[in-house]
Every structure is written in structure tokens, then in C-alpha cells.
A protein has these predicted regions:
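Glycine-rich cofactor phosphate-binding loops and adjacent beta1-alpha1 units
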Residues: 148, 176, 198-249
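Glycine-rich beta-strand-centered segment in the early N-terminal region that forms part
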Residues: 22-36, 50-91, 115, 124
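Short cysteine clusters
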Residues: 39
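Residue-level marker of beta-strand positions
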Residues: 64, 83-84, 108, 143, ...
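Short Gly/aromatic-enriched secondary-structure transition segments
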Residues: 45-49
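Mid-domain Rossmann-like dinucleotide-binding core that forms the NAD(H)/NADP(H) cofactor-binding site
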Residues: 128-208
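NAD(P)H dinucleotide-binding glycine-rich loop of Rossmann-like/cofactor-binding domains
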Residues: 91-156
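Extreme N-terminal starter segment of soluble prokaryotic enzymes
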Residues: 1-4
Length: 249
């Protein structure tokens, strides 16, 4: 079977190729991509190249994806053609470092050693494709938020008001944290305004004196570096140098 694949060739250089899908192995599965969301790593790959994301030229990419099962090997159980699934990128390919190569922006992808609840999940019919495309980034949010010992008095600072940061905030609230004790730091006022509508405070780190504004919201604590935020937890959901200029306490 031939299919159209979106390929990464280099910085600001993507293109389509017609590729041949291998025959489905006894333990494997072929699925059709229905909806894919765009990860920040995909955007960075376009802008700056894929080397930092272990993405060499001439590979497929995209990993936040919802699929429909097309064919399963004879040893694959619990799933059938027509079922909608969400792959787990780290285990859907033989090499976890190639999670970004999954092929979520192509027509079809190939899942090796397909096992339900291990490298893919069957989706509830009540969940739309667009909602399901957020499973992968929200799983990152939940993974980190669940490491915190949360109470209604917990003060949390979230660096980055994108999908990962918003997911962390939602999970913290779900576990008992108070919205008024969660503060976002981001350079995008648009993002901060959206989260303000959900009851979260925000500080724009592109503005002068943002550190003092943050301390005003979280309280101040002293450490060997001097005064800093009294937050119980700081979640880095930006991966940028500037936002992490908050002195540790």
C-alpha cells in the first residue's frame, strides 16, 4: 500500500513523498491518521531545524495524533479495524528516541508490537478527534503535576502558559489546589488573558519588574540568593532560559 508522508528535510523545508507501507506483521498494526495536533517541538523543528529533537533529515514526524485502525496482525488482540486509537509515541516505535518520528502528519503509520494500554489506547466514542489529539501533551502535564503534594493552600508558579502549563494547572485544581494560588509566567499576554478567564493569575515576563510582581502574588521567601518567590512548587513548562530567572527558595 502506498501513502503520502510528510517528510522533514531541513530547517523550514518540509515536503510530501509517496512511500510504501510494509506488510503488517503478526504483532503489529497499521492505522490511518485522523487528526494531529502540533507540538512545540514541531514548531521548533520548522523554525530552527530538528537536530535538537533527534530528528534527522528525510524522516516522517508528528506524534500528537488520533488514528483509526486499518489492519492488525494475527497476534494483536483487543482491537479491530475501525476502532479509534491514540498511540503512545515512546512505545509505538522500536526506539523510544524516535518518538518524534512516529509519522503523525502522514496518511498512515505503522505501530510495532501493538498492545492495548501499553503503546496505544482505544478511545471512548464520546471523545472527539480534536479532544483526543490533546491526550499526548496532557499526559505530560498530568505526569509532572502528580509529583506534587497538593493541598488547597499550595502555591504554584507555572512557567509557560501553553498547553502543557495549562494542563498542569487543570490537574493541580483537580487534585485540590486553589486557582487563586496558581500563577502563570509567560511572555504572551494573549495566553495570560485566556487563563485569567479561568481564574488564574498571570505575570508577563516581557515587562520590567515582573519578578517583583510575581513575589507580590506568591509572597516572598529568603534563600542564599536573597529574596525570591515563596512558591511551594515551580513547574517549568516553557523550556526557556528567561522565565527560570526566579531565585530558588
Amino acid at each position: 500500500m502506498k501513502y503520502n508522508a510528510l517528510m522533514y528535510y531541513g530547517q523550514k523545508y518540509f515536503g510530501f513523498e509517496e512511500l510504501e507501507m510494509p506488510a503488517c506483521g503478526e504483532n503489529d498494526m497499521i492505522v490511518k491518521n485522523l487528526t494531529a495536533s502540533i507540538c512545540g517541538s514541531d514548531t521548533d523543528t520548522w523554525l530552527n531545524g530538528g537536530e535538537l529533537h533527534y530528528l534527522p533529515p528525510r524522516v516522517e514526524f508528528g506524534h500528537e495524533v488520533v488514528c483509526e485502525v486499518v489492519e492488525t496482525g494475527k497476534n494483536v488482540t483487543g482491537v479491530k479495524p475501525g476502532d479509534r486509537i491514540a498511540p503512545y509515541p515512546l512505545k509505538a516505535t522500536p526506539n523510544p528516541r524516535k518518538a518524534g518520528y512516529l509519522g503523525g502528519f502522514s496518511e498512515y503509520l505503522y505501530i510495532t508490537n501493538a498492545k492495548e494500554d501499553e503503546n496505544f489506547w482505544i478511545l471512548d466514542e464520546r471523545m472527539s478527534n480534536k479532544e483526543a489529539a490533546l491526550i499526548e501533551p496532557l499526559s505530560v502535564s498530568i505526569h509532572v503535576a502528580d509529583r506534587a503534594n497538593v493541598t488547597e493552600k499550595t502555591i504554584a508558579v507555572i512557567l509557560g502558559a501553553g498547553i502543557i502549563g495549562a494542563g498542569v494547572a487543570a490537574r493541580l485544581v483537580d487534585r485540590g489546589a486553589a486557582r487563586e494560588h496558581i500563577v502563570f509566567v509567560d511572555r504572551s499576554q494573549y495566553r495570560l488573558d485566556l487563563l485569567a478567564k479561568q481564574g488564574f493569575a498571570g505575570v508577563n515576563s516581557a515587562e520590567p519588574g515582573w519578578q517583583q510582581k510575581l513575589i507580590g502574588l506568591t509572597g516572598m521567601a529568603y534563600c542564599v540568593y536573597g529574596p525570591g518567590s515563596a512558591a511551594d512548587y515551580i513547574f517549568d513548562c516553557a523550556g526557556s532560559i528567561d522565565p527560570i530567572a526566579i531565585e530558588p527558595t
